[in-house]
Amino acid sequence: MEYQEEASLASAEDSTFIASSPVQSVSEMKSIKQKSFQYFDDYEKNVSDKTIQFQKLQMTAKEIIDAFERDSTQRTLQIESLESKIGEQERDLNNEKLASETLREKTQLLEKENGALKVENGYLYEKSRKLEEEMAHLKKKCNVYKSKFEESSLRCKSLYSSNTKLKDSMETMKRRMETETKEMNKIKPKNDSESDRFKRNSQSLSQQSPLLDVHSPDNSNHRTMLNINNSSPIKPKKIFKPNEVKNRISRLQKTFADLENQHHSFQQICQTLRKRLENDSSTTKQRLSKLEEIIRNRAPPSYSFSLNCSHTYQPVSCVEPVNHDLS
């Protein structure tokens, strides 16, 4: 606009201009006008082109600025997200560092415990080896005691059978003595002179025939008494020796007492073994329980002797009255 105003002012007629030649000045003025118009047109074109270029450049710059702003905003967001990620990673690293320190401390403690467990394992291995040796020794002892127990059981059975036989023989002899005494009482003497003598003989026979040894030199009178009456049915078939029977019974009692003592000692040994093997393997406990069951099932019975002979004999010749109480 300023250029147009200047051009209009320049194109206005100047009243102060005095031309030397009117024709030349008019033509020159026209050419000058044309040139000035053309110049202004070119200038306006140039200005408009430059204005358009400037506007384009301005728009481009604005787009670039907007793009830069968008890019900077995006970059800012990315930076913020990266900063947050870095913060999270730092926290994770700190947590991992703490966890690694805790793990290292735990590892050190576990190494110490492992060393202590190795020492304890060696001690327990040595102890288990000693226990195995002791178990083998105890097993041998148990086998020995088992064999002894079986032998003692067999001895108990044999002694029980012999005791039964002895009781039967004693009862048989007692019944025989009673029968013979009754038969002797039923026999009548032939004359009065032999009556007293027969009574004495019968009394002596009832007292001494199953008990005295008629073959001994001290009992010669009794030998003559037995030979007086050959028709007498009383003949001693078996010599009864009370002292020998009593000694035999006492020996049996001692034997049974020894067997009971052995049985009690064996029970005590089994109790000791059970106390020792409380913390041992189940196999040994099963064997020990089997031994205890064998002891319970095969315990020797308690034998009691009740052989009593309380018959009092009448004194004959030099024989003193004897009270045989075999208890």
From Swiss-Prot:
Protein location: Nucleus; Cytoplasm, Cytoskeleton, Microtubule organizing center, Spindle pole body
Polar residues biased stretches: 217-232
One GO location term (cellular component): nucleus
Compositionally skewed regions (Low complexity) per UniProt: 202-212
UniProt GO MF annotations: identical protein binding
Disulfide bonds: none
Keywords (A to Z) from UniProt: Coiled coil, Cytoplasm, Cytoskeleton, Meiosis, Nucleus
GO biological process, one term: dynein-driven meiotic oscillatory nuclear movement
Coiled coil: 66-188, 243-297
Domain of life: Eukaryota
Segments of skewed composition (Basic and acidic residues): 175-199
Primary residence: nucleus
Spans annotated as Disordered: 175-234
Assembly notes: Interacts with alp4, kms1 and mbo1.
Role this protein plays: Has a role in meiotic nuclear oscillation and recombination. Required to remodel astral microtubules into the 'horsetail' astral array maintaining the 'horsetail' nuclear movement. Promotes homologous paring of chromosomes during this movement.
Listed name of the protein: Meiotic coiled-coil protein 6
Biological source species: Schizosaccharomyces pombe (strain 972 / ATCC 24843)
